[in-house]
């Protein structure tokens, strides 16, 4: 494993295919721009896939799981045992992402990077077990440097498996009690923003719980604040194993030329970290939705992202990204299947 592989060159979109796809959109039997953002989505996908008529038939979903030591500060409404129990639910097909992946015909893998209470014999889960969760980041860095590197590499390896399966779109999901706190702490550091502006209820905290979470994050920022300018240090000190894996996956997608569809708040923070590690990866990231967590909007703005959906989602797992896939597919189908003015013998607008 080469150190700092994430700095390697990212693939470039195909400008010729972008031009050809845009020209095709202008010839289709509709007023120019009348399909709104669906037109630009199709054009962007054409450039990224290097095909005038892109398609998204083969989807890959990986849910990365890891627990967080900061739960010891009382920042979550749920116990950490839920993480391992949800892994079982994922592979048995009962979780939201399991249902959605099945409906999409997508491959679904589950990677345990470090649950606090693992179910070791659980078939269908990749057990990497880099740690029994992260350290409590109000007392010490969440991860050691080697742990963080291994978690980044785990995301990269997942994309390699997706590539070997011929996948055209990668969706990363996450599961980990305490990970909205970790994501909010990272966002505060990366955006140089106060916790009060970015912290939300996560899995269901009341107002006093949210205030307590913000205070915990401020303590962590005071401890690790000297490293805010370094995205790797921010990731390892304030992040989580699953967040690092997501960042690694997004970077690998850009390097391999695979489009990544980013899910909610936690995934978007991982994407922001990935872009800070290698800005060129931004072109390969599409953003599925704007979630209910207040910090999500700030992260999306920092990434100049235009999410496809706004449904008040805050589940995670990759579920919001899975919900956006049919929209992307319909953009491709319209782009490829509509007739041009010439083909339909319909009068075009005057030149």
From Swiss-Prot:
Q: Which domain of life is it from?
A: Bacteria
Q: Which GO terms describe its biological process?
A: cobalamin biosynthetic process
List the catalysed reactions: 5,6-dimethylbenzimidazole + nicotinate beta-D-ribonucleotide = alpha-ribazole 5'-phosphate + nicotinate + H(+)
Q: What is the lineage of its organism?
A: Bacteria, Pseudomonadati, Pseudomonadota, Gammaproteobacteria, Pseudomonadales
- Tell me which species this is from: Pseudomonas aeruginosa (strain LESB58)
Q: Which family does it belong to?
A: Belongs to the CobT family.
**HAMAP family reported in the protein's UniProt record:** CobT
Listed EC numbers: 2.4.2.21
Query: What is the protein's name according to its record?
Result: Nicotinate-nucleotide--dimethylbenzimidazole phosphoribosyltransferase
